[in-house]
Amino acid sequence: MEVAAKLRGAGLSAQKARLVADQIRGKSVEEALDLLAFSTKKGAAVIKKVLESAIANAEHNEGADVDELKVSTIFVDEGLTMKRIRPRAKGRADRIFKRTCHITVKVADQ
């Protein structure tokens, strides 16, 4: 039994979120939550909320035992990129890319 949780449009780049996602892939949910709780990266807090949602989905919808769950699949896709302008000297302007991502976490029995 595999249960998923998704977050679409998270406010960080996919590249930065993947750094955190790669650390918890394949680990038990307890170990993954510990890693995320003590990580200093912004993506860790976002992914932790998605993982907790997936655990709650498994408990509520499937009646799964939390102690036997592991992070079976986690992936991060690029979301929309919002384009902004930053005024510069002499009438010039630079483009600023506000990147977003879609985070998907799947937990399954070991």
Swiss-Prot record:
Disulfide bonds: none annotated. InterPro entries: Ribosomal_uL22, Ribosomal_uL22_bac/chlpt-type, Ribosomal_uL22_bac/org-type, Ribosomal_uL22_CS, Ribosomal_uL22_sf. Keywords: Ribonucleoprotein, Ribosomal protein, RNA-binding, rRNA-binding. GO terms for biological process: translation. One of its GO terms (cellular component) is cytosolic large ribosomal subunit. GO terms for molecular function: rRNA binding; structural constituent of ribosome. Belongs to the universal ribosomal protein uL22 family. PANTHER family: CHLOROPLAST 50S RIBOSOMAL PROTEIN L22-RELATED (PTHR13501), LARGE RIBOSOMAL SUBUNIT PROTEIN UL22M (PTHR13501:SF8). This protein binds specifically to 23S rRNA; its binding is stimulated by other ribosomal proteins, e.g. L4, L17, and L20. It is important during the early stages of 50S assembly. It makes multiple contacts with different domains of the 23S rRNA in the assembled 50S subunit and ribosome. HAMAP family: Ribosomal_uL22_B (MF_01331_B). Part of the 50S ribosomal subunit. This is Large ribosomal subunit protein uL22. It comes from Teredinibacter turnerae (strain ATCC 39867 / T7901). The gene is rplV.
